[in-house]
Design a protein with these regions (language model features):
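Conserved micro-motifs of the catalytic ATP-binding
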Residues: 18-25, 61-64
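Short conserved segment of the HATPase_c
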Residues: 112-125
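Conserved catalytic submotifs in the C-terminal HATPase_c
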Residues: 25, 45, 50-60
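Conserved glycine-rich
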Residues: 153-154
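Short helix-loop "hinge" at the ATP-lid/N-box region of the Bergerat-fold HATPase_c
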Residues: 80-81
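A residue-level detector for a conserved hydrophobic packing site
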Residues: 69-70
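A conserved beta-strand-to-alpha-helix junction within the catalytic ATP-binding
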Residues: 25-41, 52
Length: 175
């Protein structure tokens, strides 16, 4: 029954995100990345992961909903930690190129088959591998990521080869 109430809560979160007015503002993406990373500390430690964080010390000001984008980073980190090989490295990086900021979350673990990648962001999708490894998840975390980024009119890409998987999303730099 606890699992069912968590599922209901996740579905309500999605509904709220889809119907919510975005609070677009200028905010520091570096700060959001650090907050998401800090809130994942216990899960990362429990998996024995090393973190390699390349987050600029200077502010990277972007345009968007701070809370929703922090949720995106958190969900990506949570997924990366969940499917990383215990004791491996988890990477969180933030770079700027022109009008866009790029956030990358990368882990070492099983390679995601190419045919699975387009399905990752579908509601309730769980790969065969994640079904056996992730008993608590619902296949909603990446769907939430996609929903939030679509509201922001931003992109996310996934690469997975030789046991390294990376998710990179864009954010519009503040003017």
């Amino acid at each position: 029954s606890r699992r069912l109430s968590r599922l209901v809560r996740r579905m309500l979160d999605i509904s709220q995100i889809q119907n919510q007015e975005m609070r677009k503002e200028e905010f520091d993406l570096c700060e959001s990345a650090r907050i998401a990373l800090l809130s994942m500390e216990k899960k990362i430690t429990d998996r024995g992961l090393d973190v390699d964080a390349e987050i600029p010390e200077d502010s990277v000001m972007v345009q968007g909903d701070r809370d929703l984008i922090t949720q995106v980073i958190y969900n990506l980190l949570e997924n990366a930690a969940k499917f990383a090989t215990p004791g491996s490295k988890l990477y969180l990086g933030l770079t700027v190129n022109g009008e866009k900021a790029y956030v990358t979350v990368r882990n070492a673990g099983a390679t995601i088959p190419a045919e699975e990648i387009p399905l990752l962001f579908e509601r309730f999708h769980k790969s065969d591998k994640s079904r056996s490894e992730d008993k608590d998840g619902y296949g909603l975390g990446l769907y939430i990521v996609k929903t939030i980024l679509a509201q922001h009119k931003e992109q996310i890409t996934v690469t997975s080869e030789n046991g390294v998987t990376a998710f990179t999303f864009t954010m519009q730099m503040a003017r």
